[in-house]
Amino acid sequence: MGASENLGQGPPPPHSRKRARELVLGLQDEICNELESLDGGQSFRTDSWERPEGGGGRSKVMREGRVFEQGGVNFSEVHGEELPPSILNQRPEAKGHPWFATGTSMVLHPRNPYVPTIHLNYRYFEAGPVWWFGGGADLTPFYPYLEDARHFHRVHKQACDTVGPELHKVFKPWCDEYFYLKHRGETRGVGGIFYDYQDGSGVLYKGQNSEGPAAQVSRELGPHPKSWEQLFELAKACGKAFLPAYVPIVEKRQEQAYGDRERQFQLYRRGRYAEFNLVWDRGTIFGLQTNGRTESILMSLPPLARWEYGYVAPADSREALLTDLFTRPQNWFEDATLEERCRPHQAVD
């Protein structure tokens, strides 16, 4: 691989900002068009906005759809002179450089409790010679179906493998680690992939838990330098994995009959989703610190949620299986006990 491919931490290639912008903007359009067809009841309302300090974005929101109770797909392209603390804490060498960030983020809250909530985010950042890619997607079911979790992970592993077979080995446990509610002692859902600060240097894990599973796997694998082009292709492959990873699950579950019990549990679990986004999510913190558009930053929150003091799922119930198994990191492909635990609760198709 020649130096022209920009392996490692060299400067970004020409037109890097334009290409990153076009990638995430294209993902927003492609995904929204497919979701409108899937919903068949509502369209996305588009709001374009400008950021006084520099840049702007485009938010697309669907409300009261046939399939999606609420969904938001946001694109932003922002720039400025002064970096926020959330970035400088991670990359102090970026201090003093004008910065640029672009990305697309999405959260869909389906109406039917048997259809999982999903989140996606892919982004690119530059500040002088400093650049990196970040992103990921994760699935939050309210009722447990083993094959849905396996399908979602399988499609994203295949996307990562197009760039390097080592990537998913780190990005899967990193996702489990990132989408973790420390105050609840549980993950937000069944995970997926998550990566950040991928600057080509070869260190795959750049999170905050140096003793966690993702960090351990990253150390065992050693450095795997990547070019800007390879990391661009990773974002492209993973972004395009969204529809084949999620649409078949929606199509399979959206017509399943449900009652008030399922709806109430869905709303209760949505409360956990809101807790994570408001307390732990770095994207929310970055947006608020940089005077982003509040409506777009908080559009990931569910339209309805509820809290119940001291709630415990009934013993040996589907709700208990969700809480005990599907909010804990799992080896979805190699753990033979998962089927044994799921089958008595109709969680195996």
Curated annotation (Swiss-Prot):
Region ranges (Important for dimerization): 273-308
Record region (Disordered): 1-21, 37-60
Enzyme class: oxidoreductase
Cellular location(s): Cytoplasm
Site residues by UniProt (Important for dimerization): 183
Positions annotated to bind substrate: 105, 121-123
Cofactor: a divalent metal cation
Xref: Pfam families: Coprogen_oxidas
Catalytic machinery residues: 119
Catalyzed reactions per annotation: coproporphyrinogen III + O2 + 2 H(+) = protoporphyrinogen IX + 2 CO2 + 2 H2O
GO cellular component annotations of the record: cytoplasm
Keyword entries, A-Z: Chlorophyll biosynthesis, Cytoplasm, Heme biosynthesis, Metal-binding, Oxidoreductase, Porphyrin biosynthesis
Entry-linked PROSITE patterns: COPROGEN_OXIDASE
Chief location: cytoplasm
GO MF term set: coproporphyrinogen oxidase activity; metal ion binding; protein homodimerization activity
Function summary: Involved in the heme and chlorophyll biosynthesis. Catalyzes the aerobic oxidative decarboxylation of propionate groups of rings A and B of coproporphyrinogen-III to yield the vinyl groups in protoporphyrinogen-IX.
Assembly notes: Homodimer.
Entry's family note: Belongs to the aerobic coproporphyrinogen-III oxidase family.
Name of the protein: Oxygen-dependent coproporphyrinogen-III oxidase
Species per Swiss-Prot/TrEMBL record: Prochlorococcus marinus (strain MIT 9313)
Name of the encoding gene: hemF
